[in-house]
Amino acid sequence: MTKQMTDKEKHKEAMDFGPVYTQFEGKTKDAMLHLCIVKTGICIHAFKRDDIGDVDIAWGQPNDPTTGKGGYGLSHILTDHGEEIKDFNFDPIDFILLVLNFGKLNSQGKKNRIYLEGKDYRLIVTTEWYGVKQQLLLTAFDLRPVSRKNPQRAREMRKAPKR
């Protein structure tokens, strides 16, 4: 019999990113490369931009394979959106750096979210994590419609019988 987690237990688990790395403050690429090696933890203030302030980067977790939801952080971006990013002919780490540095700030989105974007991509930083004020890299992804992302898949979808 499995015990249901209380809200307090869920909050504690969500806040437990693992080891806290402070030596990568302002060293975004080094922070991401380190997290790719250790696959756990959070790098505090790894990125800073004048219009949004400091951003922490956590290893996080990929989407739940059964629901396709719930992922966050660098692990989520690399696992769940890495192939989309490679379609832009960028290494995912370099792509994240590019968007963090040069993406246009769009503050018209959801509450507690910062959107940095271009014509075909979006990176999201959350400003609150389970009720705690913290700017954390959440996700990055391709905004192109399926037909432009993956023309082969779009052709297959058009050929599929209608239900």
Where are these regions (language model features)?
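Ribonuclease/tRNase effector modules and their secretory precursors
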Residues: 1-163
